[in-house]
Swiss-Prot record:
Bilayer-spanning residue ranges: 82-104
Keywords tagged on the record: Membrane, Transmembrane, Transmembrane helix
GO CC terms of this entry: membrane
Location relative to the cell: Membrane
Name used for this protein in its record: Uncharacterized protein PM1386
Membrane topology: Single-pass membrane protein
Top-level division of the source organism's lineage: Bacteria
Amino acid sequence: MAQGYAWFCCASNSSTRFSNATNFSRVRINTCVCTSNSSRVTKSSFANCACNVCLSLASASCPKSLIPCGRESWICCITCSIFFGFSIIASYFLKFHLLYVILLQIKTFFRD
């Protein structure tokens, strides 16, 4: 059991309630959910998407033994969400950078 409060926790579809806010039972990483201080669990489609993408990339690129915290840990869910967030930011940066380069080329073309 993990002690402490977490923003994200991964839970199976069958078990979506916790007994209290400080003791989390062992759960699988089928779906990602946002937890609050209450015992109710609300699903977040963004977190679910982040976990699914990250886990599919991690399982495709390396064996399960090399994934730092394993598939059963909620820490992996947090790591996946952060990784997915950074990848979204990086993709937007690349899009804007390419747009900037194209606009510079157009400006140079019309100047000449």
